[in-house]
Amino acid sequence: MPEVLTLGVKPNFTDYSEKERELIAGAAMILYPTANYAQFFTTLGKPFFPSLETCLYADEKIKQTTLFSMLGIPHPRTRIYYHLHHQDIVRDFSFPFVAKLPRASSRGRGVYKIETPEQLEAYLRRTPVAYIQEYLPHERDLRVILVNYEPILSYWRHRDPANFRANLHQGATPRFVGIPQEALSLARKAALQCKFNDVGLDLIRCRETWYVIEANMEYGREGLAMKGMNLKQILRDKLLSGELMPASNGQGNAAAAGRAAGVA
């Protein structure tokens, strides 16, 4: 991306050279800062992409669930249990249910279908904070990738019959046809409500209702690659068109800090 200068992430701002600090200060926009730098840039009034919310809610299932609840976004019944309340889980949920690691459970890892007390005990040995969710029977889920709140790709993920997780890394099969507009509208509305402007949302239809399961900020690129789509080029086009920048900034070069090294 020739319009972007990649500086990389450094733990101390003073580790950047004087020239690099000048570039950051003068950039029209910062691309893909870390969550820490995103907070600093917010205070400074420096435009950046993606949004602060996208950065802060990444890999934070507990925060996402609370946000969905507060915003009224349809989401499976979910409760959080700290160690002293682990015994309440079987009172509140009937087997089977889903248990997830609150963090580091991407690509289908750290997600468990709990069918017995023994499986629950094994899960609780993995995490002091239990994230418990009702099990929604399904044969497939829907991944919707949105950039700047607009869906750029959506596809079904048909799960492997031997695996309850509909994830490509867990053997699911992608299908790109028959995507319902109702689901795309919900995904776009949820992204706007949450202010997630670079995200892969997972949705499931169960009992005639669409549910938003979770938001993935580090969404996989496999689906994009299958359709011959280049995310870097998509972002470049949106950057040059001014879509990613406030209108007052116009079009121009953007100095990239933090995670931009993975995009530029």
Give short role names for the model-derived ranges.
Residues 55-141, 181, 237-241:
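Active-site nucleotide/adenylate-binding loops and adjacent lid/helix of ATP-dependent enzymes
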Residues 97, 153, 211-213:
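Protein kinase-like catalytic core scaffold
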Residues 196-207:
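A short glycine-rich, hydrophobically flanked beta-strand micro-motif that places a catalytic Asp/Glu
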Residues 33-37, 54, 151, 157-158, ...:
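Short glycine-enriched loops at secondary-structure junctions
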Residues 102, 135-136, 145, 202-204, ...:
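Anionic group-transfer/hydrolysis microenvironments
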Residues 1-80, 87:
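Conserved N-proximal alpha/beta basic substrate-recognition cap immediately N-terminal to
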Residues 111-191:
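Phosphate-binding site of ATP-dependent enzymes
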